[in-house]
Amino acid sequence: MNMQDANKEESYSMYPKTSSPPPPTPTNMQIPIYQAPLQMYGYTQAPYLYPTQIPAYSFNMVNQNQPIYHQSGSPHHLPPQNNINGGSTTNNNNINKKKWHSNGITNNNGSSGNQGANSSGSGMSYNKSHTYHHNYSNNHIPMMASPNSGSNAGMKKQTNSSNGNGSSATSPSYSSYNSSSQYDLYKFDVTKLKNLKENSSNLIQLPLFINTTEAEFAAASVQRYELNMKALNLNSESLENSSVEKSSAHHHTKSHSIPKHNEEVKTETHGEEEDAHDKKPHASKDAHELKKKTEVKKEDAKQDRNEKVIQEPQATVLPVVDKKEPEESVEENTSKTSSPSPSPPAAKSWSAIASDAIKSRQASNKTVSGSMVTKTPISGTTAGVSSTNMAAATIGKSSSPLLSKQPQKKDKKYVPPSTKGIEPLGSIALRMCFDPDFISYVLRNKDVENKIPVHSIIPRGIINRANICFMSSVLQVLLYCKPFIDVINVLSTRNTNSRVGTSSCKLLDACLTMYKQFDKETYEKKFLENADDAEKTTESDAKKSSKSKSFQHCATADAVKPDEFYKTLSTIPKFKDLQWGHQEDAEEFLTHLLDQLHEELISAIDGLTDNEIQNMLQSINDEQLKVFFIRNLSRYGKAEFIKNASPRLKELIEKYGVINDDSTEENGWHEVSGSSKRGKKTKTAAKRTVEIVPSPISKLFGGQFRSVLDIPNNKESQSITLDPFQTIQLDISDAGVNDLETAFKKFSEYELLPFKSSSGNDVEAKKQTFIDKLPQVLLIQFKRFSFINNVNKDNAMTNYNAYNGRIEKIRKKIKYGHELIIPEESMSSITLKNNTSGIDDRRYKLTGVIYHHGVSSDGGHYTADVYHSEHNKWYRIDDVNITELEDDDVLKGGEEASDSRTAYILMYQKRN
């Protein structure tokens, strides 16, 4: 070769031009000699790799254009080679560039040449066995694409083939694959199996069983299904029904081997169905025999279970028993009921129970109780409500039939609000007013469990430094009032960084700080840390006594100091007359305390913005509850969200109406018509309602009186006044009043009052007071202090003043019990008529008693008896002294004349 020819030819290597070494003589070694190059880059490259560096896999590992030669299954034969003579062409129109000199050999395209190197007649070419890149080869058709390829991927054997010289070669050779065939990218598409129907015997039949047979697989599926049913603790009837369904599915599925409960969707051809159908009878017989054996075992197990059920009663009862069951189970149940022995109730399969539960929930969503608001979405046009009045603190101006009642706790699962983050105090207070399940939901929430101040109460005394026994006795009684502590705990979860700061909730924060010291966990952690120097001498004794009683109550040295609480009270205007060291009335302090908490919560609600109200309404997932919220928003007339209401909020209030829509004046009068017993219409009566804005405190302690004043010869025959109350004051001055029930009846007796009619005549009016609504926590005060007038010698009464009269204490014993049922005589007729729960709505249990010791009203001492629900015990707390009591000890006091301890305030809670 001259230099001019070398310049014309493009070089592929930096090494001198050499010819490929001759391949070794074919032997029986099962190793590949030459392999196709491996593409290393995403673009066209032609790297030179030695044959031993390439894995001998006959699969498309790199991409779909990877060269896979059909001779790979037979390592004795080299792949055919493209024409490397400059004058020849290939089928795929590759640009052939000469690398090595050829001496006229014959290529696979039929071009002739001299066989200078291949003189041995072995049928093998001594030229380069592969091209530099697979794109230049016309033989990169994969062997798997050929329908005629065998399991060893070899080509059709030809006994006679001509070599390059035209002579017949005796050694066997293989014809090349048809180069006109194109590579099929979708060769594994199951729809193309129709084209290979004639060769379906060589295809893999599905389902494929490895190390097993079709009958064994079906039997194993039956056993696995039975084990799953036993794990679900179902009865034998459901197992038999499932086995019948599974058996029928076994005869109709395409694969004829997979049970119904584990069936998979498969695409098969008609030819495969015929092949599988030929194999079905043998597998079906084996499965049928196995099913008979398992049914015999299930019958024995069913009898054993029936005997156990007859001997042992059912612990639980399925909630849904009215639904229709499958026919098989009905027939079995009828056969069982014919026997004289008692049979257990037929249980349902788990799928039937689940479907019935869904149906029952849907039905319960459609059915609305009489005390609930009709379920209507917010986008609706009307909202149905019940015709009864509001609950205890819903003391409205209206007696319209559109008034809705406080939603009761639901039997169905509670849908909690979807709140985001910590809410302000006003939002929490609103939820507690109108969502009866909100308090219990918050207390069950694990996220706020560690934030509440009081988890479990440990009895502790309160140090009496300056005649504050009236305050400590009230705080102790409220501490053991569980509904009140629940309200305090939920209010403690508020967002303290909201616009309504702590300055407007002084008493609430003081109560939280005070009651946190009675928490058992807090006390146990700080048992020794908070001991004063004066108490260190008794520290070890207190520790021993407390541990010996498992912290049931603390020693005297561990009493709570009320200094901070008292200091906070002195800064509140309502308690401005409170003087340190001056004795006060316990009932008066209790009333002021509840009033102040009520006002602070109302102030927090009034401070809510329109945006906060919209967020709260959006978080409510119960449509009935949402409508009830909207109807009560207008009761907060001084609130910012009412004064600056957005058009959207105004639209909602106008759509669903308001609770009090009969009068615009806060304490206005309105007229209602009545009727006599004979059915004739009487004169109209004036009705006046004193409105109280709802708060968590008023919902808990607030009730309502109905005072009826009958005026003869007057324009209005009756005057009805609805007044709220937090404490019922019972007069016990009458000699016939010796027990609590008689005091209630005496409370509702009519009294005659002088009255001037509308015509100007003096008449005698008759007045009666009834209980219209009962609170959840009933506070009762005995009127033990009465004013006694001095009488002169002529038996003429003198002026009513402090100089001519005196205040004396009524020290007689008033009997009361642990249970109280409000007599019907004390309830209003409307309440009794609308009451659906009967006597249970008037049933209470005793939880606290405040005693007064002494004979005068301006002195004496206060103690308290409290019921600890967690310990199920009564404790008597006298400042720092705590004594455990029997139940009967609480009912004693005042029997003897020398005993000045008499019950003054009773606390009753409604029984759940």
UniProtKB/Swiss-Prot annotation:
GO terms for biological process: negative regulation of mitophagy; protein deubiquitination; protein retention in Golgi apparatus; proteolysis; regulation of ER to Golgi vesicle-mediated transport; regulation of protein stability; regulation of response to osmotic stress; regulation of retrograde vesicle-mediated transport, Golgi to ER. InterPro entries: Papain-like_cys_pep_sf, Peptidase_C19, Peptidase_C19_UCH, USP_CS, USP_dom. Residues 1-30, 68-176, 241-384, 396-417 are annotated as: Disordered. The active site is at 469 (nucleophile), 861 (proton acceptor). Residues 460-911 form the USP domain. Residues 1-11, 260-310 have a biased composition (Basic and acidic residues). SUPFAM superfamilies: Cysteine proteinases. PROSITE patterns: USP_1, USP_2, USP_3. GO terms for molecular function: cysteine-type deubiquitinase activity; mRNA binding. GO terms for cellular component: cytoplasm; cytosol; mitochondrion; nucleus; Ubp3-Bre5 deubiquitination complex. It catalyses: Thiol-dependent hydrolysis of ester, thioester, amide, peptide and isopeptide bonds formed by the C-terminal Gly of ubiquitin (a 76-residue protein attached to proteins as an intracellular targeting signal). Its EC number is 3.4.19.12. Residues 249-259 have a biased composition (Basic residues). Residues 82-95, 102-140, 159-176, 335-355 have a biased composition (Low complexity). Present with 2210 molecules/cell in log phase SD medium. Has an ATP-independent isopeptidase activity, cleaving at the C-terminus of the ubiquitin moiety in natural or engineered linear fusion proteins, irrespective of their size or the presence of an N-terminal extension to ubiquitin. Plays a role in regulation of silencing by interacting with SIR4. Also, in conjunction with BRE5, cleaves ubiquitin, leading to the subsequent mono-ubiquitination of SEC23. Required for ribophagy, a process which relocalizes ribosomal particles into the vacuole for degradation in response to starvation. This is Ubiquitin carboxyl-terminal hydrolase 3.
